[in-house]
């Protein structure tokens, strides 16, 4: 917003605003490309929302996301994160769909049933034919997701240009879809805009399987299973699982779901170490007041202390609304662009609950060797849809859908000896809760614990301490507008070449010298690092 002159002579080729994981990835690649880079992080530690924090004496937990789902092994290897301290637990991370009164269903990351009702025997129906149909359609969904994988990795093309890079990206995407063959291509076109409720009811018999896949389709979004476009978000998640495997030196190979030792903060620390080793500098506890603009070009930043740091290029890891409307200012943008940014849907709908436990909880029908996996409370599609219905009216459900991990099962160092941590992502927790969060925070936390108690009798008696992070808390603590972990809703109209808005969908912005690299860019949230890498490539002038 400032147009003042440089104050103290500090100058870099690139300044990255925000030391979240995407900002750190961006800084590492820029430094490797020969640029002088400074990362400015307002918090006292790097990582943004990908940090490990102590929430009770001796108990540490990943503050937001608690598993790596879509970070590619190729990127982990390319940045040599293993050499910078990143390691993963040995546990083969599976998804376990819990049942309150029966046997749970165990799934692989791409939806393949590997145990429980629907595994081997029959998609919940007790027939070999049912199992065959179940596996056949899952294979189809994964083929469709694999065809969409290049969309996740690449820079979205611009429409209406003759630039070879844009034309090549469109041709590559068209070729990937064409390679599916007539049947699969027709199916992709048929189901792409459907709701996941109808798709799963048409093709699977097991309520647990339907519920688990439906939950994955809407996790972290403002959608329910019956919402149009929720098949697309399921394919998006499956595409991340397809894209994730690769040879890595710091853990097991080819696993889409990974639990880092030390929590997600270990990923951020390794990224910071890699960036510094490449030549980047990082300053924590340093908040940016505004982006300096001179001659209609980003020329640096002004800190809240008044210090001005000049740069040829400014890359913002901050969410798009905060970048354009607060740090830059609408006076440097045309009215149409400003309106599109203002209308971005950015209100979060997921909460995070942390429990410090005096013992390991036992879940109904679950053997102890399965407790180190990802556990889901989403017993049916109707259950998830009913939870979503309340959120539309600014309310929370008495029966929320929940993703649970017990990170201390695989990483005992996160809690005192013999104690455990439970980390839960809860759908749905409206940002604009009717009558506000302050008076209802305890009630919501109690509902979540009571819901888990139905699947893990005795859980409540083992709770030593509780921490709830509702969307307004995420907004305040991690400076994310609306507390949305994707920085902006992930939906058809806010994806790919429309993300965050036309005119800024290729990481470049309407202001020369200003780029975006955060989760509000393509391909969205989750600890992937793709947006940071692609933004760096754009700055360096390399083809993604």
Please place each PLM-identified region on the residue numbering.
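Extreme N-terminal leader/targeting segments of oxidoreductases
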Residues: 1-14, 32-33, 495-497, 501-502, ...
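N-terminal glycine-rich phosphate/pyrophosphate-binding loop and immediately adjacent elements
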Residues: 7-162, 487
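Conserved FAD/dinucleotide-binding core of flavoprotein oxidoreductases
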Residues: 113-122, 265, 321-326, 356-358, ...
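Flavin-binding catalytic cores
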Residues: 128, 360-361, 393-397, 437-476
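A glycine-rich dinucleotide-binding beta-alpha-beta segment and adjacent secondary-structure elements
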Residues: 206, 211-227, 378, 396-405, ...
């Amino acid at each position: 917003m400032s147009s003042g002159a440089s104050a103290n002579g500090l100058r870099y080729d690139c300044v990255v605003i925000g030391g979240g994981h995407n900002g750190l990835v961006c800084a590492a690649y820029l430094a490797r490309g020969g640029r002088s880079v400074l990362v400015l992080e307002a918090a006292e530690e790097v990582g943004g929302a990908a940090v490990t924090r102590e929430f009770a004496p001796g108990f540490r937990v990943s503050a937001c996301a608690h598993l790596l789902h879509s970070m590619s092994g190729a990127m982990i290897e390319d940045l040599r994160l293993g050499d910078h301290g990143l390691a993963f637990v040995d546990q083969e991370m599976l998804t376990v769909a819990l049942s309150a009164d029966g046997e749970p269903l165990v799934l692989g990351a791409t939806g393949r049933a590997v145990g429980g009702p629907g595994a081997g025997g029959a998609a919940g129906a007790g027939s070999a034919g049912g199992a065959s149909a179940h596996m056949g359609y899952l294979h189809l969904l994964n083929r469709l997701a694999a065809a969409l994988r290049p969309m996740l990795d690449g820079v979205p093309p611009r429409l209406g240009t003759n630039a070879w890079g844009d034309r090549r990206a469109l041709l590559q995407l068209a070729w990937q879809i064409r390679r599916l063959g007539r049947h699969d291509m027709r199916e992709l076109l048929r189901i792409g805009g459907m709701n996941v409720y109808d798709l799963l009811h048409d093709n699977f018999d097991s309520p647990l399987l339907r519920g688990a896949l439906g939950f994955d389709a809407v996790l972290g979004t403002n959608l329910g299973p019956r919402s149009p476009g929720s098949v697309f978000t399921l394919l998006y998640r499956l595409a991340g699982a397809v894209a994730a495997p690769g040879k890595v030196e710091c853990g097991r190979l080819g696993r889409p779901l990974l639990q880092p030792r030390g929590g997600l903060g270990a990923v951020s620390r390794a990224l910071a170490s890699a960036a510094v080793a490449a030549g980047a500098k990082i300053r924590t506890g340093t908040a940016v007041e505004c982006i300096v603009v001179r001659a209609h070009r980003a020329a640096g930043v002004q800190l809240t202390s008044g210090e001005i740091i000049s740069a040829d290029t400014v890359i913002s890891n901050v969410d798009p609304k905060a970048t354009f409307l607060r740090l830059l200012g609408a006076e440097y943008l045309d009215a149409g662009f400003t309106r599109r940014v203002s209308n971005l849907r950015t209100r979060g709908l997921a909460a995070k609950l942390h429990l410090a436990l005096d013992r390991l909880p036992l879940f109904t029908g679950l053997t102890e060797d399965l407790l180190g996996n990802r556990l889901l409370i989403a017993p049916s599609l109707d259950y998830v849809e009913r939870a979503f219905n309340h959120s539309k009216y600014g309310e929370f459900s008495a029966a929320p859908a929940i993703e649970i991990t017990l990170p201390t099962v695989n990483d005992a160092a996160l809690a005192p000896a013999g104690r455990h941590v439970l980390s839960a992502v809860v759908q749905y927790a409206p940002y604009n809760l009717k009558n506000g969060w302050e008076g209802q925070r305890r009630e919501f936390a109690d509902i979540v614990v009571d819901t888990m108690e139905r699947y893990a009798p005795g859980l409540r008696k083992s709770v030593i301490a509780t921490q709830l992070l509702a969307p307004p808390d995420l907004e305040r603590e991690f400076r994310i507008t609306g507390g949305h972990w994707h920085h902006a809703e992930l939906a058809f109209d806010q994806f790919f070449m429309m993300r965050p808005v036309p005119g800024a969908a290729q990481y470049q912005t309407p202001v020369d010298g200003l780029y975006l690299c955060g989760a509000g860019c393509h391909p969205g949230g989750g600890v992937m690092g793709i947006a940071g890498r692609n933004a760096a490539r754009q700055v360096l002038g390399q083809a993604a």
